Amino acid sequence: MIFGELRRLYLIIGVMLSYGLDELIPKTRLTLPLRLGRNLLFWMPNNHAQRMLGERLRLALQELGPVWIKFGQMLSTRRDLFPPAIADQLAMLQDRVQPFDGALARAHIERSMGQPLETWFDDFQQEPLASASIAQVHTARLKNGQEVVIKVIRPDILPMIKADMRLMYRLASWVPHLLPDGRRLRPVEVVLEYEKTLLDELNLLREAANAIQLRRNFDGSPMLYIPEVYPDYCSETMMVMERIYGVPVNDVAALEKQGTNMKLLAERGVQVFFTQVFRDSFFHGDMHPGNIFVSFEHPENPQYIGIDCGIVGSLNKEDKRYLAENFIAFFNRDYRKVAELHVDSGWVPPDTNVEDFEFAIRTVCEPIFEKPLAEISFGHVLLNLFNTARRFNMEVQPQLVLLQKTLLYIEGVGRQLYPQLDLWKTAKPFLEEWIKDQMGLPAILRALKEKAPYWAEKLPELPELVYDGFKQHRLLQKSVDRLTVEMRVHHVRQSQSRFLFGIGATLLLIGTFLMTQGADEGSLPAWLMAAGTVSWIIGWKRTA
């Protein structure tokens, strides 16, 4: 470690100990050096002993800064790593930090655009509209009068991220050596997944492309509106998009005051999620309340507004089909089908004992279904499923973890808006219709239509391909026949060699025995030994 890393590590240890996080260290023989080391750092007492452990962990991560805040937010979705009380506290982490100087933002914009800011924008507000750990947002107008927001990456964030990521990897590499269950948790993979997410958020060109894709997917939809992005003004560290006005989705009082149809709004949240996942295979992966607003227009026919598209997820056709069938099998309590789907999809190893897996799923999930369907959480069903599957060596599926996190957000918001929301009743027709569309006659006809141009292109080559196929088959058959003959000859030679080896060994033993007995047989022992040697040589040559 270089001096800077050691200093940062000392600071991190100091913050963690000041919140008493040494309580998270398990009391095992492997962790004895860590616990002894804690006792040596007597000048770093627990200053928050009156608080619960989960709250202390959340406060410590907030104090450590942006990289650790976002890491805690990601860990809140991995409920196989922590008890529910701690995971719930991590989910409360707020991605809000002190803004950086607006003059720095102005200088960054001018550097990115290559000209004075006034060349492109009017009414630039140096005071930020919002500030988060990765970037902050300023308002302005384009020269045509269009109100926009300008998102600017923090100027000092990249060196901080790189330094803290190096420390995270180092700490993660220690976990398997310190915890009995450390290898199963795959700590290095967790950090790797986090680093990828974080680096994606640092590239605003990626976020701009995501927003453009989502806007196109929901163009003209009454359910969701994505603000327009202006690509000509965007770079890796700066993004310009349309300014929107709406009610924060978690401001229930304001929504009710304007007469919003809360039942329809809650149901549309579910429909938006399943449309993104199953129709578009492209979903907003950070749909927490801070990124979702409700339009002021048409409260009786409410429309969501989505921003901050830095994190998105996608599922391939196989994952979508297995996921949809899993949901339906789950709510039909067909646990055998759920277990088989996991094996068929490759999410768990092919040698998994299906009966044991089915029993484990039944044990965990059957108590959930004692509740009325309207009270059952899709997200927690998925969470229990993944946690059970991990005990059967399910590989970490980043796209499914992100989907589960997003589903929990959607459920939480939906039930906050309309507590009687029946998620299953809203989602089941959508899932059943999607499966029927994917597996019925329309799906076959659609596949034929998609493949038709390719087949038409290859049709003139078909006679030649058939001829080449027959020719290759003939050549292969000749090779097989020749190989069969060679194997038979080799087998005969091996049999003869074994026979000659046996004769040679017998003659040598008899000749040696007669010679050691001193029998008066003249030159017979020598002749026997010579014959045995010749037999060995002939047998050896046949094997060569």
Swiss-Prot record:
GO BP terms: namely: regulation of ubiquinone biosynthetic process; ubiquinone biosynthetic process
According to its UniProt record, which residues of this chain constitute the active site?
A: 286
Provide the residue positions that the database annotates as binding ATP. Answer: 129-137, 151
Question: Major location, coarse class?
Answer: membrane
Named from the GO MF annotations, one term is: ATP binding
The annotated topology with respect to the bilayer is: Multi-pass membrane protein
Q: Where are the transmembrane segments?
A: 1-21, 499-519, 520-540
- Got a GO cellular component term for this one? plasma membrane
Source superkingdom: Bacteria
Q: Where is the signal peptide?
A: none
As for subcellular location, the record says: Cell inner membrane
- Outline the extent of the Protein kinase domain: 123-500
Q: What family, per the record?
A: Belongs to the ABC1 family. UbiB subfamily.
Q: What does this protein do?
A: Is probably a protein kinase regulator of UbiI activity which is involved in aerobic coenzyme Q (ubiquinone) biosynthesis.
Report what the protein is called. Answer: Probable protein kinase UbiB
- What gene is this protein a product of? ubiB
